């Protein structure tokens, strides 16, 4: 029986995350989630099991509420880079999950790099 799109997405997400964990043990993870309406990003310390910082298009401070485009993704990336500095994080590895590194996901990564976060 053929796998559904959702099942393939979950397999891809787990495959990507497991490969990243093997290589980047002990480092902070920059995790991206993209939905049809919003983008959210978290800095996660997997060793402690805590979220150090987060940013989303749902936040009114960013001025992009309800927008899901590349410009909004870039603002979220810049915001997470700024919050990472406040949390004392200068380096993280990028976890794209099951999403392709293209468009909005790529815009988040590039804006975070421009903001001073080493990815």
Swiss-Prot record:
This is Large ribosomal subunit protein uL18. GO terms for cellular component: cytosolic large ribosomal subunit. One of its GO terms (molecular function) is structural constituent of ribosome. The keyword Plastid does not apply. GO terms for biological process: translation. HAMAP family: Ribosomal_uL18_B. This is one of the proteins that bind and probably mediate the attachment of the 5S RNA into the large ribosomal subunit, where it forms part of the central protuberance. NCBIfam families: L18_bact. Part of the 50S ribosomal subunit; part of the 5S rRNA/L5/L18/L25 subcomplex. Contacts the 5S and 23S rRNAs. Keywords: Ribonucleoprotein, Ribosomal protein, RNA-binding, rRNA-binding. Belongs to the universal ribosomal protein uL18 family. It comes from Roseobacter denitrificans (strain ATCC 33942 / OCh 114) (Erythrobacter sp. (strain OCh 114)). InterPro entries: Ribosomal_uL18_bac-type, Ribosomal_uL18_bac/euk. Transmembrane segments: none annotated.
